[in-house]
Amino acid sequence: MNDKQHGPFIVEGKLADSERMKQESNFLRGTISEDLTNGLTGGFEGDNFLLIRFHGMYQQDDRDIRAERAEQKLEPRHAIMLRCRLPGGVITPQQWLGIDKFAEENTLYGSIRLTNRQTFQFHGILKGKVKLAHQLLNQVGLDSLATANDVNRNVLCTSNPIQSELHQQAYEWAKKISEHLLPRTRAYAELWLDKEKVATTDEEPILGSTYLPRKFKTTVVIPPQNDVDLHANDLNFIAIAEGSKLVGFNVLVGGGLAMTHGDKNTYPSMASEFGYIPLEHTLAIAEAVVTTQRDWGNRTERKNAKTKYTLERVGVETFKAEVERRAGVKFEAIRPYEFTGRGDQIGWLKGIDDKWHLTLFIENGRLLDYPGKPLKSGVAEIAKIHKGDFRLTANQNLIIAGIPESEKQRIETIACRHGLIDDKTTVQRKNSMACVSFPTCPLAMAEAERFLPEFVTHVEQLMNKHGIGDEHIVLRVTGCPNGCARAMLAEVGLVGKALDRYNLHLGGNRIGTRIPRMYKENISSQAILSIMDELIGRWATGRQPNEGFGDFLIRTDIIKPVLDSARDFYDWQEAV
Protein backbone atom coordinates (compact mmCIF):
# COMPACT_ATOMS: atom_id res chain seq x y z
CA MET A 1 0.00 0.00 0.00
CA ASN A 2 1.11 3.53 -0.73
CA ASP A 3 0.42 5.41 2.48
CA LYS A 4 0.49 8.76 0.66
CA GLN A 5 -3.05 8.59 -0.68
CA HIS A 6 -4.54 11.18 -3.02
CA GLY A 7 -7.71 11.24 -5.06
CA PRO A 8 -11.26 12.52 -5.16
CA PHE A 9 -12.39 10.45 -2.16
CA ILE A 10 -9.44 11.18 0.13
CA VAL A 11 -10.02 13.79 2.83
CA GLU A 12 -7.18 16.28 2.42
CA GLY A 13 -5.89 18.44 5.25
CA LYS A 14 -3.80 18.29 8.38
CA LEU A 15 -3.78 14.77 9.75
CA ALA A 16 -5.04 14.04 13.25
CA ASP A 17 -2.23 13.58 15.78
CA SER A 18 -3.14 9.91 16.11
CA GLU A 19 -1.87 9.46 12.55
CA ARG A 20 1.53 10.84 13.54
CA MET A 21 1.56 8.53 16.54
CA LYS A 22 0.90 5.45 14.40
CA GLN A 23 3.41 6.47 11.73
CA GLU A 24 6.17 6.96 14.31
CA SER A 25 5.31 3.86 16.35
CA ASN A 26 7.57 1.43 14.46
CA PHE A 27 4.61 -0.83 13.75
CA LEU A 28 3.01 -0.47 17.21
CA ARG A 29 6.17 -0.84 19.32
CA GLY A 30 6.67 2.75 20.40
CA THR A 31 8.67 2.89 23.61
CA ILE A 32 6.37 0.50 25.44
CA SER A 33 9.25 -1.76 26.53
CA GLU A 34 11.00 1.20 28.20
CA ASP A 35 7.75 2.28 29.85
CA LEU A 36 7.32 -1.16 31.38
CA THR A 37 10.51 -0.70 33.38
CA ASN A 38 9.66 2.83 34.56
CA GLY A 39 8.75 2.38 38.21
CA LEU A 40 8.15 6.11 38.81
CA THR A 41 4.61 5.89 37.45
CA GLY A 42 1.93 3.24 37.42
CA GLY A 43 0.85 4.24 33.93
CA PHE A 44 2.06 4.40 30.35
CA GLU A 45 3.10 7.83 29.13
CA GLY A 46 3.01 9.83 25.91
CA ASP A 47 2.13 7.90 22.77
CA ASN A 48 2.32 4.62 24.66
CA PHE A 49 -0.90 5.52 26.48
CA LEU A 50 -2.67 5.06 23.12
CA LEU A 51 -0.37 2.49 21.54
CA ILE A 52 -1.12 -0.14 24.18
CA ARG A 53 -4.69 -0.17 22.88
CA PHE A 54 -3.51 -1.93 19.72
CA HIS A 55 -2.30 -4.65 22.08
CA GLY A 56 -5.76 -4.95 23.66
CA MET A 57 -5.32 -2.69 26.68
CA TYR A 58 -6.72 0.56 28.02
CA GLN A 59 -5.11 2.59 30.75
CA GLN A 60 -7.66 3.46 33.42
CA ASP A 61 -7.79 4.60 37.01
CA ASP A 62 -10.18 4.26 39.93
CA ARG A 63 -12.34 7.36 39.56
CA ASP A 64 -13.99 6.80 42.93
CA ILE A 65 -10.70 7.78 44.60
CA ARG A 66 -9.24 10.11 41.96
CA ALA A 67 -10.04 13.34 43.84
CA GLU A 68 -8.84 11.91 47.15
CA ARG A 69 -5.50 10.91 45.62
CA ALA A 70 -5.15 14.32 43.99
CA GLU A 71 -5.57 15.96 47.40
CA GLN A 72 -2.79 13.73 48.70
CA LYS A 73 -0.59 14.82 45.76
CA LEU A 74 -0.62 11.28 44.39
CA GLU A 75 -1.06 10.32 40.76
CA PRO A 76 -4.30 8.50 39.90
CA ARG A 77 -4.40 4.82 40.80
CA HIS A 78 -3.51 3.65 37.31
CA ALA A 79 -4.42 0.15 36.22
CA ILE A 80 -4.88 -1.63 32.93
CA MET A 81 -8.02 -3.12 31.43
CA LEU A 82 -7.16 -6.00 29.09
CA ARG A 83 -9.62 -7.34 26.51
CA CYS A 84 -9.10 -10.79 25.00
CA ARG A 85 -9.45 -11.62 21.31
CA LEU A 86 -12.06 -14.35 21.15
CA PRO A 87 -13.75 -14.55 17.73
CA GLY A 88 -17.28 -15.87 18.08
CA GLY A 89 -16.94 -15.95 21.86
CA VAL A 90 -15.93 -19.62 22.11
CA ILE A 91 -13.55 -20.62 24.91
CA THR A 92 -12.63 -24.01 26.37
CA PRO A 93 -13.11 -24.89 30.06
CA GLN A 94 -9.32 -25.28 30.38
CA GLN A 95 -8.79 -21.77 29.02
CA TRP A 96 -11.47 -20.49 31.38
CA LEU A 97 -9.74 -21.95 34.42
CA GLY A 98 -6.55 -20.14 33.40
CA ILE A 99 -8.22 -16.75 33.14
CA ASP A 100 -10.21 -17.37 36.34
CA LYS A 101 -7.00 -17.99 38.27
CA PHE A 102 -5.34 -14.89 36.82
CA ALA A 103 -8.31 -12.66 37.67
CA GLU A 104 -8.33 -13.95 41.23
CA GLU A 105 -4.61 -13.57 41.86
CA ASN A 106 -3.49 -10.65 39.71
CA THR A 107 -6.24 -8.02 39.37
CA LEU A 108 -7.46 -5.36 41.76
CA TYR A 109 -11.12 -6.32 41.43
CA GLY A 110 -10.92 -10.12 41.18
CA SER A 111 -13.63 -10.22 38.53
CA ILE A 112 -14.09 -11.36 34.94
CA ARG A 113 -16.25 -9.02 32.86
CA LEU A 114 -18.12 -10.57 29.94
CA THR A 115 -18.68 -7.96 27.25
CA ASN A 116 -21.30 -7.50 24.56
CA ARG A 117 -18.57 -8.09 22.00
CA GLN A 118 -18.39 -11.76 22.99
CA THR A 119 -15.18 -11.64 24.94
CA PHE A 120 -13.97 -11.00 28.47
CA GLN A 121 -12.05 -8.21 30.12
CA PHE A 122 -9.72 -8.12 33.09
CA HIS A 123 -10.04 -4.87 35.02
CA GLY A 124 -7.41 -3.61 37.42
CA ILE A 125 -4.11 -5.09 36.23
CA LEU A 126 -1.18 -3.15 37.66
CA LYS A 127 1.58 -2.29 35.20
CA GLY A 128 3.97 -4.78 36.76
CA LYS A 129 1.53 -7.62 36.02
CA VAL A 130 0.70 -6.69 32.42
CA LYS A 131 3.31 -8.89 30.80
CA LEU A 132 2.23 -11.79 32.98
CA ALA A 133 -1.34 -11.35 31.69
CA HIS A 134 -0.25 -11.64 28.07
CA GLN A 135 1.92 -14.64 28.83
CA LEU A 136 -0.95 -16.36 30.62
CA LEU A 137 -3.20 -15.81 27.61
CA ASN A 138 -0.50 -17.21 25.34
CA GLN A 139 -0.08 -20.30 27.52
CA VAL A 140 -3.77 -21.16 27.10
CA GLY A 141 -3.80 -20.36 23.37
CA LEU A 142 -5.31 -16.86 23.49
CA ASP A 143 -4.17 -13.28 22.90
CA SER A 144 -5.44 -9.70 23.06
CA LEU A 145 -4.00 -8.41 19.79
CA ALA A 146 -6.20 -5.92 17.94
CA THR A 147 -9.09 -5.81 20.40
CA ALA A 148 -8.87 -2.03 20.60
CA ASN A 149 -7.85 1.03 18.57
CA ASP A 150 -7.71 1.48 14.78
CA VAL A 151 -7.94 -2.13 13.61
CA ASN A 152 -10.57 -4.79 13.01
CA ARG A 153 -11.75 -5.68 16.51
CA ASN A 154 -13.06 -8.96 17.93
CA VAL A 155 -15.29 -10.62 15.31
CA LEU A 156 -18.75 -11.53 16.59
CA CYS A 157 -20.82 -14.57 15.65
CA THR A 158 -24.43 -15.38 16.57
CA SER A 159 -24.56 -17.70 19.59
CA ASN A 160 -27.52 -19.85 18.59
CA PRO A 161 -26.95 -23.22 20.27
CA ILE A 162 -29.96 -24.87 18.62
CA GLN A 163 -28.52 -24.57 15.11
CA SER A 164 -25.36 -26.41 16.11
CA GLU A 165 -24.23 -27.41 12.62
CA LEU A 166 -24.86 -24.00 11.06
CA HIS A 167 -23.30 -22.23 14.04
CA GLN A 168 -20.11 -24.24 13.67
CA GLN A 169 -19.80 -23.27 10.00
CA ALA A 170 -20.46 -19.59 10.72
CA TYR A 171 -18.08 -19.65 13.68
CA GLU A 172 -15.29 -21.02 11.49
CA TRP A 173 -15.77 -18.05 9.14
CA ALA A 174 -15.67 -15.62 12.07
CA LYS A 175 -12.28 -17.08 13.01
CA LYS A 176 -11.02 -16.91 9.41
CA ILE A 177 -12.08 -13.27 9.04
CA SER A 178 -10.43 -12.39 12.35
CA GLU A 179 -7.14 -14.04 11.37
CA HIS A 180 -7.16 -12.57 7.86
CA LEU A 181 -7.56 -8.99 9.11
CA LEU A 182 -5.11 -9.18 12.03
CA PRO A 183 -2.08 -6.87 12.12
CA ARG A 184 1.05 -8.62 10.80
CA THR A 185 3.54 -6.72 12.98
CA ARG A 186 5.65 -8.81 15.36
CA ALA A 187 5.41 -6.11 18.02
CA TYR A 188 2.93 -8.07 20.16
CA ALA A 189 5.11 -11.19 20.25
CA GLU A 190 8.28 -9.20 20.90
CA LEU A 191 6.88 -7.02 23.68
CA TRP A 192 4.78 -9.48 25.64
CA LEU A 193 6.02 -12.97 24.74
CA ASP A 194 9.75 -12.18 24.60
CA LYS A 195 10.05 -13.37 21.02
CA GLU A 196 13.30 -12.47 19.30
CA LYS A 197 13.40 -9.44 17.05
CA VAL A 198 13.69 -10.57 13.44
CA ALA A 199 15.92 -8.55 11.13
CA THR A 200 13.21 -7.98 8.54
CA THR A 201 11.01 -5.03 7.78
CA ASP A 202 7.47 -5.24 9.09
CA GLU A 203 4.74 -4.99 6.50
CA GLU A 204 1.01 -4.49 6.84
CA PRO A 205 -0.39 -5.45 3.42
CA ILE A 206 -4.02 -5.00 4.49
CA LEU A 207 -3.95 -2.43 7.28
CA GLY A 208 -1.03 -0.27 6.11
CA SER A 209 1.68 1.33 8.22
CA THR A 210 -0.80 3.75 9.81
CA TYR A 211 -3.50 1.11 10.23
CA LEU A 212 -7.15 2.14 9.89
CA PRO A 213 -8.52 5.67 10.38
CA ARG A 214 -10.66 4.44 13.28
CA LYS A 215 -11.84 1.25 14.98
CA PHE A 216 -13.58 -1.29 12.76
CA LYS A 217 -16.11 -3.91 13.88
CA THR A 218 -17.24 -7.07 12.09
CA THR A 219 -19.98 -9.63 12.69
CA VAL A 220 -21.22 -12.94 11.34
CA VAL A 221 -24.99 -13.11 11.87
CA ILE A 222 -27.29 -16.15 11.72
CA PRO A 223 -30.95 -15.16 11.21
CA PRO A 224 -33.47 -15.10 12.77
CA GLN A 225 -31.32 -13.97 15.71
CA ASN A 226 -29.76 -10.49 15.67
CA ASP A 227 -28.04 -10.96 19.03
CA VAL A 228 -24.86 -9.32 17.70
CA ASP A 229 -26.74 -6.09 16.83
CA LEU A 230 -25.41 -5.96 13.28
CA HIS A 231 -26.28 -2.27 12.81
CA ALA A 232 -23.67 -1.37 15.43
CA ASN A 233 -20.92 -2.72 13.18
CA ASP A 234 -18.88 -1.61 10.16
CA LEU A 235 -19.01 -4.92 8.30
CA ASN A 236 -21.63 -7.65 8.62
CA PHE A 237 -21.97 -11.07 7.04
CA ILE A 238 -25.54 -12.39 7.31
CA ALA A 239 -25.52 -16.18 6.95
CA ILE A 240 -27.59 -17.61 4.12
CA ALA A 241 -28.20 -21.34 4.40
CA GLU A 242 -29.75 -24.09 2.34
CA GLY A 243 -31.01 -26.51 4.94
CA SER A 244 -28.23 -26.76 7.51
CA LYS A 245 -25.51 -25.87 5.00
CA LEU A 246 -24.04 -22.37 4.87
CA VAL A 247 -23.82 -21.27 1.23
CA GLY A 248 -23.00 -17.56 1.39
CA PHE A 249 -23.52 -14.21 3.05
CA ASN A 250 -25.51 -11.04 2.60
CA VAL A 251 -23.04 -8.19 3.19
CA LEU A 252 -24.04 -5.02 5.06
CA VAL A 253 -21.58 -2.17 5.60
CA GLY A 254 -21.39 1.03 7.61
CA GLY A 255 -23.24 0.57 10.88
CA GLY A 256 -22.07 2.35 14.02
CA LEU A 257 -23.54 3.96 17.13
CA ALA A 258 -20.95 6.33 18.61
CA MET A 259 -21.56 10.07 18.63
CA THR A 260 -20.37 13.14 20.50
CA HIS A 261 -22.66 15.21 22.72
CA GLY A 262 -23.30 18.59 21.09
CA ASP A 263 -21.73 17.71 17.73
CA LYS A 264 -24.42 17.25 15.08
CA ASN A 265 -21.83 16.04 12.60
CA THR A 266 -21.77 12.80 14.59
CA TYR A 267 -24.68 10.37 14.78
CA PRO A 268 -25.55 6.66 14.97
CA SER A 269 -26.12 4.95 11.65
CA MET A 270 -27.63 1.75 10.26
CA ALA A 271 -25.58 -0.54 8.02
CA SER A 272 -26.35 -0.47 4.27
CA GLU A 273 -27.05 -3.55 2.18
CA PHE A 274 -24.35 -4.21 -0.44
CA GLY A 275 -25.51 -7.60 -1.73
CA TYR A 276 -25.02 -11.36 -1.54
CA ILE A 277 -21.76 -13.28 -2.05
CA PRO A 278 -20.99 -17.02 -2.20
CA LEU A 279 -18.73 -18.29 0.59
CA GLU A 280 -15.56 -18.41 -1.51
CA HIS A 281 -15.52 -14.60 -1.83
CA THR A 282 -15.85 -13.86 1.90
CA LEU A 283 -12.23 -13.00 2.69
CA ALA A 284 -11.75 -11.03 -0.53
CA ILE A 285 -14.80 -8.89 0.25
CA ALA A 286 -13.76 -8.44 3.89
CA GLU A 287 -10.32 -7.28 2.79
CA ALA A 288 -11.72 -4.97 0.09
CA VAL A 289 -14.11 -3.25 2.52
CA VAL A 290 -11.30 -2.76 5.03
CA THR A 291 -8.80 -1.42 2.48
CA THR A 292 -11.36 0.94 0.94
CA GLN A 293 -12.10 2.35 4.38
CA ARG A 294 -8.35 2.42 5.08
CA ASP A 295 -7.76 4.63 2.04
CA TRP A 296 -10.95 6.71 1.97
CA GLY A 297 -11.68 7.12 5.68
CA ASN A 298 -11.21 10.56 7.24
CA ARG A 299 -7.76 10.78 8.86
CA THR A 300 -8.05 14.50 9.64
CA GLU A 301 -10.94 14.28 12.15
CA ARG A 302 -11.32 11.19 14.31
CA LYS A 303 -14.92 12.02 15.17
CA ASN A 304 -15.79 11.51 11.51
CA ALA A 305 -13.38 8.69 10.71
CA LYS A 306 -15.69 5.68 10.98
CA THR A 307 -16.93 3.77 7.94
CA LYS A 308 -20.47 5.15 8.35
CA TYR A 309 -19.20 8.69 7.65
CA THR A 310 -17.16 7.52 4.66
CA LEU A 311 -20.29 5.99 3.12
CA GLU A 312 -22.26 9.17 3.77
CA ARG A 313 -19.53 11.32 2.20
CA VAL A 314 -18.78 9.30 -0.96
CA GLY A 315 -22.11 7.50 -1.36
CA VAL A 316 -23.03 3.87 -0.79
CA GLU A 317 -22.93 2.96 -4.49
CA THR A 318 -19.48 4.53 -4.98
CA PHE A 319 -18.06 2.68 -1.97
CA LYS A 320 -19.71 -0.58 -3.06
CA ALA A 321 -18.30 -0.27 -6.60
CA GLU A 322 -14.80 0.25 -5.20
CA VAL A 323 -15.16 -2.85 -3.03
CA GLU A 324 -16.22 -4.85 -6.08
CA ARG A 325 -13.25 -3.50 -8.06
CA ARG A 326 -10.72 -4.35 -5.36
CA ALA A 327 -12.17 -7.80 -4.65
CA GLY A 328 -12.78 -8.71 -8.27
CA VAL A 329 -16.27 -9.78 -7.20
CA LYS A 330 -19.72 -8.52 -8.18
CA PHE A 331 -22.36 -8.51 -5.48
CA GLU A 332 -25.49 -10.48 -6.29
CA ALA A 333 -28.96 -9.34 -5.20
CA ILE A 334 -29.60 -9.56 -1.47
CA ARG A 335 -31.09 -12.92 -0.47
CA PRO A 336 -34.22 -12.86 1.76
CA TYR A 337 -33.58 -12.83 5.51
CA GLU A 338 -35.61 -11.99 8.59
CA PHE A 339 -34.86 -11.24 12.22
CA THR A 340 -37.33 -12.15 14.95
CA GLY A 341 -35.33 -11.49 18.11
CA ARG A 342 -31.96 -10.77 19.67
CA GLY A 343 -32.19 -11.80 23.30
CA ASP A 344 -30.60 -14.98 24.63
CA GLN A 345 -32.87 -17.91 25.48
CA ILE A 346 -31.95 -18.30 29.13
CA GLY A 347 -32.04 -21.84 30.52
CA TRP A 348 -31.82 -25.27 28.93
CA LEU A 349 -32.01 -25.87 25.18
CA LYS A 350 -31.46 -29.09 23.27
CA GLY A 351 -29.33 -28.96 20.13
CA ILE A 352 -29.81 -31.10 17.05
CA ASP A 353 -26.86 -33.28 18.13
CA ASP A 354 -28.72 -34.41 21.29
CA LYS A 355 -26.35 -32.34 23.42
CA TRP A 356 -27.79 -29.80 25.85
CA HIS A 357 -26.88 -26.14 26.16
CA LEU A 358 -27.38 -24.11 29.34
CA THR A 359 -27.51 -20.34 28.89
CA LEU A 360 -26.79 -18.50 32.14
CA PHE A 361 -27.98 -14.93 32.65
CA ILE A 362 -25.05 -12.90 34.00
CA GLU A 363 -26.30 -9.47 35.06
CA ASN A 364 -24.08 -6.85 33.40
CA GLY A 365 -21.67 -9.64 32.46
CA ARG A 366 -19.84 -9.25 35.78
CA LEU A 367 -18.55 -12.55 37.18
CA LEU A 368 -17.53 -12.01 40.77
CA ASP A 369 -18.09 -13.82 44.04
CA TYR A 370 -20.81 -11.75 45.69
CA PRO A 371 -21.94 -12.45 49.28
CA GLY A 372 -24.27 -15.45 49.06
CA LYS A 373 -23.85 -15.54 45.28
CA PRO A 374 -20.38 -16.81 44.29
CA LEU A 375 -20.89 -16.56 40.53
CA LYS A 376 -17.24 -16.63 39.51
CA SER A 377 -16.48 -19.70 41.63
CA GLY A 378 -19.56 -21.41 40.22
CA VAL A 379 -18.41 -21.04 36.63
CA ALA A 380 -14.96 -22.32 37.63
CA GLU A 381 -16.54 -25.39 39.27
CA ILE A 382 -18.45 -26.12 36.08
CA ALA A 383 -15.27 -25.64 34.03
CA LYS A 384 -13.53 -28.33 36.08
CA ILE A 385 -15.99 -31.02 34.95
CA HIS A 386 -17.40 -29.77 31.63
CA LYS A 387 -16.24 -31.56 28.46
CA GLY A 388 -17.83 -29.20 25.91
CA ASP A 389 -17.08 -25.50 25.54
CA PHE A 390 -18.21 -22.14 26.88
CA ARG A 391 -19.72 -19.51 24.59
CA LEU A 392 -19.80 -15.86 25.55
CA THR A 393 -22.80 -14.10 24.04
CA ALA A 394 -23.24 -10.60 22.66
CA ASN A 395 -25.75 -10.03 25.45
CA GLN A 396 -23.04 -10.48 28.11
CA ASN A 397 -24.30 -13.94 29.07
CA LEU A 398 -22.60 -17.35 29.18
CA ILE A 399 -23.58 -20.58 27.42
CA ILE A 400 -22.35 -23.89 28.80
CA ALA A 401 -22.47 -25.72 25.47
CA GLY A 402 -22.40 -29.38 24.50
CA ILE A 403 -23.55 -31.00 27.74
CA PRO A 404 -24.41 -34.73 27.50
CA GLU A 405 -27.66 -35.86 29.13
CA SER A 406 -25.66 -37.71 31.79
CA GLU A 407 -24.01 -34.49 33.04
CA LYS A 408 -27.07 -32.22 32.87
CA GLN A 409 -28.24 -32.60 36.47
CA ARG A 410 -24.75 -32.30 37.91
CA ILE A 411 -24.06 -29.01 36.12
CA GLU A 412 -27.49 -27.59 36.99
CA THR A 413 -26.89 -28.39 40.67
CA ILE A 414 -23.59 -26.49 40.66
CA ALA A 415 -25.17 -23.54 38.84
CA CYS A 416 -28.08 -23.33 41.28
CA ARG A 417 -25.83 -23.65 44.33
CA HIS A 418 -23.73 -20.68 43.17
CA GLY A 419 -26.61 -18.40 42.16
CA LEU A 420 -26.04 -18.80 38.42
CA ILE A 421 -29.64 -19.97 37.97
CA ASP A 422 -32.31 -17.84 39.59
CA ASP A 423 -35.94 -18.52 38.67
CA LYS A 424 -36.92 -15.12 40.04
CA THR A 425 -35.03 -13.22 37.32
CA THR A 426 -37.63 -11.39 35.23
CA VAL A 427 -37.75 -11.23 31.46
CA GLN A 428 -37.26 -7.46 31.81
CA ARG A 429 -33.96 -7.91 33.63
CA LYS A 430 -32.82 -10.43 31.02
CA ASN A 431 -33.40 -7.81 28.30
CA SER A 432 -31.53 -4.96 30.02
CA MET A 433 -27.87 -4.16 29.53
CA ALA A 434 -25.28 -1.57 30.58
CA CYS A 435 -21.67 -0.75 29.80
CA VAL A 436 -18.99 -0.73 32.53
CA SER A 437 -18.79 3.05 33.09
CA PHE A 438 -17.74 4.13 36.62
CA PRO A 439 -15.44 3.60 38.40
CA THR A 440 -12.94 2.36 35.80
CA CYS A 441 -13.90 3.85 32.43
CA PRO A 442 -12.13 7.17 31.79
CA LEU A 443 -14.89 8.31 29.40
CA ALA A 444 -17.81 7.75 31.78
CA MET A 445 -20.08 10.74 32.38
CA ALA A 446 -22.83 8.91 34.29
CA GLU A 447 -23.27 5.59 36.07
CA ALA A 448 -24.30 2.56 34.01
CA GLU A 449 -23.34 -0.90 35.34
CA ARG A 450 -23.73 0.11 38.99
CA PHE A 451 -26.93 2.01 38.17
CA LEU A 452 -28.77 -0.58 36.08
CA PRO A 453 -29.84 -3.27 38.63
CA GLU A 454 -31.81 -0.88 40.83
CA PHE A 455 -33.19 1.03 37.84
CA VAL A 456 -34.47 -2.24 36.36
CA THR A 457 -36.16 -3.00 39.68
CA HIS A 458 -38.10 0.27 39.34
CA VAL A 459 -39.03 -0.57 35.74
CA GLU A 460 -40.21 -4.02 36.87
CA GLN A 461 -42.42 -2.32 39.45
CA LEU A 462 -43.93 -0.12 36.73
CA MET A 463 -44.59 -3.14 34.53
CA ASN A 464 -46.34 -4.91 37.41
CA LYS A 465 -48.32 -1.76 38.28
CA HIS A 466 -49.77 -1.74 34.77
CA GLY A 467 -50.45 -5.48 34.71
CA ILE A 468 -47.77 -6.52 32.24
CA GLY A 469 -45.10 -7.96 34.50
CA ASP A 470 -44.48 -10.80 32.06
CA GLU A 471 -43.60 -8.35 29.26
CA HIS A 472 -40.28 -6.69 28.51
CA ILE A 473 -38.73 -3.59 26.99
CA VAL A 474 -35.24 -3.75 25.46
CA LEU A 475 -33.47 -1.34 27.82
CA ARG A 476 -29.87 -0.19 27.52
CA VAL A 477 -27.83 2.26 29.61
CA THR A 478 -24.51 3.68 28.47
CA GLY A 479 -22.37 6.01 30.56
CA CYS A 480 -21.30 8.20 27.63
CA PRO A 481 -22.25 8.65 23.95
CA ASN A 482 -19.63 6.20 22.62
CA GLY A 483 -22.27 3.51 22.56
CA CYS A 484 -20.68 0.47 24.22
CA ALA A 485 -24.01 -0.81 25.59
CA ARG A 486 -25.64 -0.26 22.18
CA ALA A 487 -28.31 2.03 23.65
CA MET A 488 -28.85 3.48 20.16
CA LEU A 489 -30.47 0.20 19.10
CA ALA A 490 -32.69 -0.21 22.19
CA GLU A 491 -36.39 0.45 22.64
CA VAL A 492 -35.38 2.63 25.59
CA GLY A 493 -31.83 3.97 25.58
CA LEU A 494 -30.25 6.07 28.32
CA VAL A 495 -27.09 7.95 27.32
CA GLY A 496 -25.11 9.49 30.17
CA LYS A 497 -24.37 13.23 30.31
CA ALA A 498 -23.46 13.81 33.98
CA LEU A 499 -24.03 12.16 37.34
CA ASP A 500 -27.69 11.06 37.35
CA ARG A 501 -28.32 12.90 34.09
CA TYR A 502 -29.17 11.08 30.88
CA ASN A 503 -30.54 11.72 27.43
CA LEU A 504 -33.62 9.53 27.03
CA HIS A 505 -34.04 7.87 23.62
CA LEU A 506 -37.22 6.05 22.64
CA GLY A 507 -38.59 4.23 19.62
CA GLY A 508 -36.11 1.51 18.73
CA ASN A 509 -37.49 -1.99 18.26
CA ARG A 510 -37.01 -5.43 19.73
CA ILE A 511 -34.95 -6.79 16.84
CA GLY A 512 -32.42 -3.95 16.65
CA THR A 513 -33.31 -2.55 13.23
CA ARG A 514 -34.35 0.98 14.18
CA ILE A 515 -32.45 3.79 15.90
CA PRO A 516 -34.30 5.37 18.85
CA ARG A 517 -34.88 9.11 18.82
CA MET A 518 -34.09 11.45 21.69
CA TYR A 519 -37.26 12.14 23.67
CA LYS A 520 -35.88 14.24 26.52
CA GLU A 521 -32.44 15.72 27.05
CA ASN A 522 -30.33 15.78 30.21
CA ILE A 523 -32.90 14.56 32.73
CA SER A 524 -32.66 12.65 36.01
CA SER A 525 -33.37 8.96 36.45
CA GLN A 526 -36.43 9.86 38.51
CA ALA A 527 -37.78 11.99 35.67
CA ILE A 528 -37.15 9.09 33.27
CA LEU A 529 -39.14 6.73 35.49
CA SER A 530 -42.04 9.21 35.60
CA ILE A 531 -42.08 9.36 31.80
CA MET A 532 -41.89 5.58 31.55
CA ASP A 533 -44.73 5.18 34.05
CA GLU A 534 -47.06 7.12 31.77
CA LEU A 535 -45.87 5.52 28.54
CA ILE A 536 -45.91 1.96 29.90
CA GLY A 537 -49.47 2.58 31.04
CA ARG A 538 -50.47 3.70 27.56
CA TRP A 539 -48.69 0.70 26.03
CA ALA A 540 -50.40 -1.72 28.41
CA THR A 541 -53.89 -0.56 27.40
CA GLY A 542 -53.39 0.51 23.79
CA ARG A 543 -51.03 -2.04 22.24
CA GLN A 544 -51.85 -4.43 19.48
CA PRO A 545 -51.21 -8.19 19.89
CA ASN A 546 -47.46 -8.87 20.34
CA GLU A 547 -46.62 -5.19 19.75
CA GLY A 548 -43.38 -4.15 21.39
CA PHE A 549 -42.99 -0.92 23.35
CA GLY A 550 -40.91 0.83 20.68
CA ASP A 551 -43.26 -0.15 17.86
CA PHE A 552 -46.21 1.11 19.92
CA LEU A 553 -44.56 4.51 20.44
CA ILE A 554 -44.00 4.87 16.70
CA ARG A 555 -47.46 3.65 15.63
CA THR A 556 -49.26 5.98 18.03
CA ASP A 557 -47.10 8.93 16.97
CA ILE A 558 -45.73 9.49 20.46
CA ILE A 559 -42.38 9.77 18.72
CA LYS A 560 -41.47 9.78 15.04
CA PRO A 561 -39.02 7.18 13.72
CA VAL A 562 -35.45 7.98 12.71
CA LEU A 563 -35.51 7.28 8.97
CA ASP A 564 -32.21 8.78 7.80
CA SER A 565 -29.97 9.44 10.78
CA ALA A 566 -27.48 11.61 8.88
CA ARG A 567 -30.32 14.09 8.29
CA ASP A 568 -33.08 13.57 10.84
CA PHE A 569 -31.49 12.16 14.01
CA TYR A 570 -31.30 15.56 15.67
CA ASP A 571 -34.79 16.73 14.68
CA TRP A 572 -36.01 15.45 18.01
CA GLN A 573 -37.98 18.46 19.24
CA GLU A 574 -40.09 18.46 16.08
CA ALA A 575 -40.50 14.69 16.21
CA VAL A 576 -41.76 14.34 19.78
Curated annotation (Swiss-Prot):
Q: Pathway it belongs to?
A: Sulfur metabolism; hydrogen sulfide biosynthesis; hydrogen sulfide from sulfite (NADPH route): step 1/1
A GO BP annotation: cysteine biosynthetic process
Q: Which cofactor does it need?
A: siroheme; [4Fe-4S] cluster
Query: How many cofactors are bound and how?
Result: Binds 1 siroheme per subunit. Binds 1 [4Fe-4S] cluster per subunit.
Name the positions where siroheme binds. Answer: C484
Q: Which GO terms describe its cellular component?
A: sulfite reductase complex (NADPH)
Q: What is this protein called?
A: Sulfite reductase [NADPH] hemoprotein beta-component
